[in-house]
Amino acid sequence: MSKSGVLLLNLGGPETQADVQPFLYNLFADPELIRLPFPFLQRAFAWAISTLRAPKSRRNYAAIGGGSPLRRITAAQAQALQAQLVAAGYDVPVYVAMRYWHPLIESVVQQIKSDGITRLVVLPLYPQYSISTTGSSFKLLDRLWAEDPELARIERRQICSWYDQPQYVQAMARAIREQLDAFEDPAGVHVLFSAHGIPESYVTQAGDPYQQEMEACVQLIWREVGRPNRHTLSYQSRVGSVRWLQPYTETVIPELGACGVRQLLVVPISFVSEHIETLQEIDIEYRELAHQAGIREFRRVPALNADPLFIAGLVALVRPHLLTSAPAFVPAAVGGSLLER
């Protein structure tokens, strides 16, 4: 007898100050995130960089309450998704797994196996595909399935990217309009879409579709917003000295201030949950940067979290794969599309 389940994937985040260094180690030990010319150096590099960055990172997490809310918010998203699936006639469990912190993918997959799941729909909570996010998690799942004959009997249906999902686009557009209307002069607001950056070489050399999907996503959302405001796309959270996708958010904000922008709305376009990049990097660092640049009114669009319209979009993504007659899918080599298995 078949038994379906849904697995939500996310990055993970440290929940206490003690978690910060081991979380960073897991992050930098992933060769899909940080690519070194000599793979045997990966673990040593991860230990060194996590040790060096931990003090500053702890201060950043302390500024937002001591730890990341990502696990709690993702659990709320899973509960909301399960409730909407049940209402639609699909009584299936929804699991949450994180790539770099607990609950780790490896342990959650064992729970899925113990629960007797025979068909698993895998939904990364990254709207746009990247080698470094969805791709990394899918590679880990591929390895786990290859190593365990019992897992190999579980049919996996993986959703690569969903930046163009209609309800997601509508939910983002609605949130933007609500924040625009809160400004003193809504028509005079400049809208800055700030996406998480990736190394430029991922796009130019490895064929990562992230930038293309991000630009298409912004166009879809802006069309749905239906306002004449000027808008810009930039990239944040750069690590290291290599060239990442540009323009950088920390460069764009002072440039906008120098051009006379006095009202700025930041849209965290690649984040569907509040975490360190929204609560600390945007709300604290970029807000201060904006004020220094002469921007007198600064707002941010909240992450969608468990917004019912957004969750309805996740239901629409998952539901076709719960049907017994639907074909199973696996990600293409690069991503962004689906191949029938």
Curated annotation (Swiss-Prot):
Predominant localisation class:
cytoplasm
Query: Which pathway, per its entry?
Result: Porphyrin-containing compound metabolism; protoheme biosynthesis; protoheme from protoporphyrin-IX: step 1/1
Q: Name one GO molecular function term.
A: ferrochelatase activity
Q: InterPro entries, per this entry?
A: Ferrochelatase, Ferrochelatase_AS, Ferrochelatase_C, Ferrochelatase_N
List the Pfam families.
Answer: Ferrochelatase
Q: Kindly list the positions annotated as binding Fe cation.
A: H196, E277
Q: Does the keyword Metal-binding apply?
A: yes
Instruction: Specify the signal sequence span.
Output: none
Q: Coiled coil: which residue ranges?
A: none
Query: What is catalyzed by this enzyme?
Result: heme b + 2 H(+) = protoporphyrin IX + Fe(2+)
Keyword terms, alphabetized? Cytoplasm, Heme biosynthesis, Iron, Lyase, Metal-binding, Porphyrin biosynthesis
Alphabetically, which GO biological process terms does the record hold? heme biosynthetic process
Q: Which GO cellular component terms are attached?
A: cytoplasm
Subcellular localization, per the record?
A: Cytoplasm
The Enzyme Commission number assigned here is: 4.98.1.1
- Function text: Catalyzes the ferrous insertion into protoporphyrin IX.
Question: Would you identify the family this protein belongs to, as annotated?
Answer: Belongs to the ferrochelatase family.
PANTHER family from the xrefs?
A: FERROCHELATASE, FERROCHELATASE, MITOCHONDRIAL
This protein is called Ferrochelatase
The gene it comes from is: hemH
